[in-house]
Amino acid sequence: MRTPFIAGNWKMNKNPKETQEFLDGVKGKLPDASKVETVIGAPAIDLTTLVAGAEGTPLKTAAENCYFEDEGAFTGETSPKALKEMNVDYVIIGHSERRGYFHETDEDINKKAKAIFKNNLLPIICCGESLAQREAGQTEDWVASQIEAALAGLSADQVKVSVLAYEPIWAIGTGKTATADQAQEVVAHIRATVEKLYNKDTADAVRILYGGSVKPANVKELMAKPDIDGGLVGGASMDPESFIALANYQD
């Protein structure tokens, strides 16, 4: 049984003071981690505050990116080794904003995935198509190729504990949402891709999220789909009340 997974991605928002206010706002109101795993992905400058505040609570923490080297002359990059030493749990990689604005390639994302595992962290690996690709009927091939490239060289055991996230680029921050049926269709295809690359056990174990304008109003419908295990949530994860509602969608 895959534990549901509700993850916030704050992107380039909130300072440490606002992070502490958020933590105070959700304290004691998140479900037990055995029921729903809750995670907040925050900018690097907020992670010290986030990790300290999440300690002893069900909330887990994620960095929004890291580099594939542990240390060195890489000005402005975030070390996965340092993230582990800070007690961060997850790292989000392959987000369409990283691919689009910062020209990250499938090869970069694969190197990052390996560096994350080398440092005993866990990846949240994103994939998704543009509107042009969807309209051209290329969604399934494109998403499968992104997943295959990201997972190259990872063991089945590593993939089982990874989290994958389907984020159609046309539905991120646009207010457009893939219907629950559209999301389920692509997420099922991602699971089938994992089965083809590995085996059924691995495909049944890996958690796959949907991201793209997920909010309290649509989370229940998305979570009712058999292959959707959670949400990677942008804007709706920044408000404590909204995040609490998402996390407690089962109630």
UniProtKB/Swiss-Prot annotation:
Family: Belongs to the triosephosphate isomerase family.
Chemical reaction(s) catalysed: D-glyceraldehyde 3-phosphate = dihydroxyacetone phosphate
Function of the protein: Involved in the gluconeogenesis. Catalyzes stereospecifically the conversion of dihydroxyacetone phosphate (DHAP) to D-glyceraldehyde-3-phosphate (G3P).
Location in the cell: Cytoplasm
Swiss-Prot/TrEMBL keywords: Cytoplasm, Gluconeogenesis, Glycolysis, Isomerase
Keyword Cytoplasm listed: yes
Transmembrane annotation, as ranges: none
GO molecular function, one term: triose-phosphate isomerase activity
InterPro entries reported for this sequence: Aldolase_TIM, TIM_sf, TrioseP_Isoase_bac/euk, Triosephosphate_isomerase, Triosephosphate_isomerase_AS
Any one GO BP annotation for this protein: glycerol catabolic process
Designated gene of the protein: tpiA
Source superkingdom: Bacteria
Sequence positions that bind substrate: N9, W10, K11, G173, S213, G234, G235
Pathway: Carbohydrate biosynthesis; gluconeogenesis; Carbohydrate degradation; glycolysis; D-glyceraldehyde 3-phosphate from glycerone phosphate: step 1/1
Active site positions: H95 (electrophile), E167 (proton acceptor)
Record protein name field: Triosephosphate isomerase
A Pfam short name: TIM
GO cellular component entries: cytosol
E.C. designation(s): 5.3.1.1
Subunit note: Homodimer.
